[in-house]
Amino acid sequence: MIAYKQFTLKVLHIAPECSPLAKKGGLGDVVGTLPKALKKQGIDARVLLPAWPGVIERAQEMGRLKKEPIGEISVALNWRAYTASVLEAEVNGTHIYLLDQPELFSDPCIYPEKLDASTVLPFIFLSFAPFELLRLTGWKPQFLHAHDWTTAPVSAALKWHRYYSYFNGDYDTVFTIHNLAFQGIIDPYVLEGWGFSPKAFSNLDMDSMEYFGQVNMMKGAITTTEAFTTVSPSYSDRKRVV
């Protein structure tokens, strides 16, 4: 009799917050608890999180942190390579990958007061990092789950990025809206430096990131992801647009 290995669904959450390591609002609570709930359903759910100031120290105190990085990843942005060390931790039963990149992830407040080409760069790195991380680890999830505008470019990259679009078909994506008020709206000149093709900002394509002459990162996620959700059914009802 042939014994078949049981199929395990794998999900990687990409987010700027994950309680208790980094939390500014409800997003951190969701990302901190959802993987544990999925694990109870037999799903291998992990988190990719920036190592903001204090995160590594908290991971050491609250869980198990491997002493040495498992490797490095590099992402090309604005015609230069940004390199991050990748650390692994387990906190409250959740497997977490930490991106240690002090140049980008140095703001203890996490979110910038104003969006411009420099202040959004940490979140673009975070959005592109999964594609490099998964080659490093050899762990391949079926789903990449992005949260809010800060990781909205994950699914957009699979459609329009000059390099990462080659991974289209390798992963399905899910996008969760936690706060519709912040959509990641920025001047369009940044797209070329991030590696997006001109199609990402075509006013002839309603699915593009173009939004009244600006880039709307959340719109790009909604139109390119396989599935999008809101943080709760009641939030969906309040924000529904016909």
Range-by-range predicted roles:
Residues 1-242:
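Catalytic cores of nucleotide-sugar-dependent glycosyltransferases that transfer UDP/GDP/TDP-activated
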